[in-house]
């Protein structure tokens, strides 16, 4: 059986995915399906580099500003909803174009979902105790040795996925990367093109984007989110672009430190994305 082919444009943050996908969609009767774990939320705009109003008017977009921060959302939910949305776009004789850089969302969509066993509460509790006693760096090194494929996709400072990786290993004796290989076949064939730029150019674009976000009012956006009653501990706010301004607003960072960390964290994130994207043969260097 031949599955419908879907074009995917992936790539690191600030590479220019949105502009490229919009231009492609305009030429090919397309609609864009966003594979971005944060642009889905209505409250997050500047810090996620969400497409502008003009860009959203130019081409129909999906999974942009569709959920509230109070609604739980995950890669699994996204993959299920995205498959239905892709089928609907095709049924209307339009061309769906997936665009995004969230590796978990792309993994779930392109490779399908896998059933990863839940760990016993005791295992998680023990890991949380170890985290407080040994620190995240020690636990991350343990994960690197046990599941290097999964570890290379993580930010060592983010403990949620780190703990998840270790609890699966301790509960099942198998790494998460093993379960990722057992995924069910998605109902589409995805043609993934990874957009990239020379590293120096990419880093310059990242630094410029951070400066532009601050000029556009990132600090005010974060203040409004916190004043609306959202906890800084919810997962979408514990991400690059929001955690740094929150630390600044709470007095933990100076303004200059916040800018430097925001740029550094974003560059580090781009490196992790590119490591994951190496699995795809089709790479396109933009200039």
Name these PLM-found stretches.
Residues 1-287:
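Phosphate/pyrophosphate-binding catalytic cores of soluble transferases and nucleic-acid-acting enzymes
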